[in-house]
From Swiss-Prot:
It is found in: Cytoplasm. PROSITE patterns: B5, FDX_ACB, TRBD. It holds the Pfam family FDX-ACB. InterPro entries: aa-tRNA-synth_II/BPL/LPL, B3/B4_tRNA-bd, DNA-bd_dom_put_sf, Fdx_antiC-bd, Fdx_antiC-bd_sf, NA-bd_OB-fold, Phe-tRNA-ligase_IIc_bsu, Phe-tRNA-ligase_IIc_bsu_bact. GO terms for biological process: phenylalanyl-tRNA aminoacylation. Keywords: Aminoacyl-tRNA synthetase, ATP-binding, Cytoplasm, Ligase, Magnesium, Metal-binding, Nucleotide-binding, Protein biosynthesis, RNA-binding, tRNA-binding. GO terms for cellular component: phenylalanine-tRNA ligase complex. The gene is pheT. Its cofactor is Mg(2+). This is Phenylalanine--tRNA ligase beta subunit. Transmembrane segments: none annotated. One of its GO terms (molecular function) is phenylalanine-tRNA ligase activity. Binds 2 magnesium ions per tetramer.
Amino acid sequence: MRISLKWLSEYVDLPAPEELARRLTAVGFEIEAVERTGAELKGVVAARIAASEPHPNAEKLSVTRVDAGGGEPLQVVCGAKNYRVGDVVPLATVGAELPGGARISKAKLRGVESFGMLCSARELGLSADASGLLILPPGTVPGTPIGEALDLDDVLLEVNVTPNRPDALSHVGIAREVAALLGQKVRLPKPGLVEGGGAAADAVKVRIEAPEKCARYAARVVEGVKIGPSPAWLARRLERCGIRSISNVVDATNYVLLELGHPLHAFDLDEVAGHEIVVRTARPGERITTLDGKDRALEPDDLLIADRDRGSALAGVMGGGDSEISAGTTRVLLESAWFAPSGVRRTSRRHGLKSEASYRFERGADPGMVIPALDRCAALIAGLSGGTVRAGVVDAQARKVASPEVRMRWDRPAQVLGMPVSREDARRILLSLGFEERASDGDAVSFGVPSWRVDVSIEEDLVEEIVRTLGYDAIPETLPGPAVRTPAESAEAQAVARARAALEAAGFSEAVNFSFVAARDLEPLAGGLAADGIALRNPISADLAVMRTSLVPSLLRNAAHNRRQRVEDVRLYEIARAYGPRAAGTPGDAPSHEATEVAGVLLGRRSPVGWAVGGDVADFHDAKAAVQGLLEALGVEAAWAAPGPGWLHPRTSAALRAPGGAALGELGELHPRVAEAFELPRGVLAFRLSLDALLAAARLVPQYRPIPRLPAVLRDVAVVVEDAVTAAAVEALVREEPLVEAVILFDVYKGAPLPAGRKNLALAITYRAPDRTLTDAEADAAHGRIVARLRERVGAELRG
């Protein structure tokens, strides 16, 4: 919004432009630019033509002598013919630079010296008229700077008005803010309306058929108008604010729009069929040609200003071409109304049509400005066009748009702002902004909100008005009282963070998937995982139709997608919720439940091929190592038992259980039918763990163990056992020896010369006593007891 300070100064006394810009920015109206006009015409003054005679050497030129207010007349050669001796015209003196870039210098034209240039409006950058010299008003004093003579000197502010403050989209709106800041009263413009002739109600009728979209529609009639150009002062004001001058009547509506902020529209009354205005919604198939020349198909939601036969305007957006003001207009119907913002907004967007009127109506016009703006504009049209305003207003009011009343506790500003605010200051500020003090009960007061403030509805809005006017910089800088404490991280959050770190350290990348999958993705996993997912009522697509009962299907689809993109080595994990029907006997009333899972998929090579590394394919032990690292990160002890559930291969899978027997999850190679269903090769490994079960068995708080100060004794043992004997069972028997500190399985071997059905397990055992240094004899005795225990319990044979 462009604001002219010369125009604004008619309503309120102003400080220096820079100070005004600073103060307005501080209260929420950011000043994006400050532009000074008239300065570009420095060196151009008013000059009276004292004499003129033909050029001795050029028929089309004249030699004039002009009085520029500096004593001796100046000789200027001129080519224009539209002047007479005694006229006052603009003179660009020697040294002046015109807007087009031309610098004036002393010159000799066809043998005659010229000391300047007499200018047209085009040469001054004021208009496109280059037909002759710009003739100034007769009383203009020679030597007056042209900016002053033509009222060109001004300062323009480019104000960024936020969408919640439509009341500030006018000069009077900004004047209200300035007056409140400076402790002044606004000098509102007086309509100066003089009525005559017959009654307006005899010339036009108004009817509202859509009260929910139009609360009020008022009209005046001006007769005997003569359409013509606007006076220079009015045209200049409009142009400075970015609006092109059209004619005196149309310019009057735009002038009041910029002055008071209320949109108006002028119709040619003789083009209004039946001299009747009907405010209604569009009928099926109805069309209208708007002022921009476009024929538009209307929707039933569009609000029309219609006459007896057809639509004449899109209400609050743009007028129609059938009833626009033309050169032959003699009777004007002037409209002032209040339209519902939502309806104007929808119509404007639907038709891609933006106007100064729609910009204001869709943000919320002032219902209290309907009649004042109408009277002001009618008086202006009558004065500019020589017309007569018929008596009275044709006013149709379908409903009243009431302004709210807001109650404020006197101590509320101090509570919100953290600084003391006296009752006197709060009352003074709100009254200066147009609020009306009403009922008071000692501790609180009610204020009536002015009709133009559509953004104020609650107590905090009043507090905002107070602090805006006081200045945000008045709020003292204070440090917070109590120390800020970081909330303790939940056990689940700690477990998730540790699980992520452990899996990423093992080379896995995190995947993030939808919680929805295709129903067909659950069917192959029926052995061990719920196959009946919760169906969505409105799925995104058939491939995302049910809630996933496990994270595994999503990860298998990720792996298949990577393979299609020629990515053969894949390690992915996901930590998220899975959903399924609630099992019978479980607590809760909901028919479904959700639980957090940790799942992963692994396929391809164990590590990238390099000069020192081969291309070994990852197997069950790689997946187990990753899961084991996760368990250790959470402090979970788990027992491994083969085989795993049915969706895993029976020979290369295992189920995990906590020491108390609670199920933790499973790990292993995909069953061939599952791999085939997801278009994956054999050998793909996957794991699924319940985070809730892991949390129940976890030791997230580290247990202190002192660094051993006594040396350990290391022994290796290799035993041959049946295939059915698990390494975990052997390890558990070894740990029964009190002096054993650690056991590591470092080799498993099957094949010749071992007989079929047997395997070799090699373990590294660490012995240590907490209170003494072990002797070799003590270590050998413990080692012997372990071998005997293995031979007795699992039929192990010591391999030499």
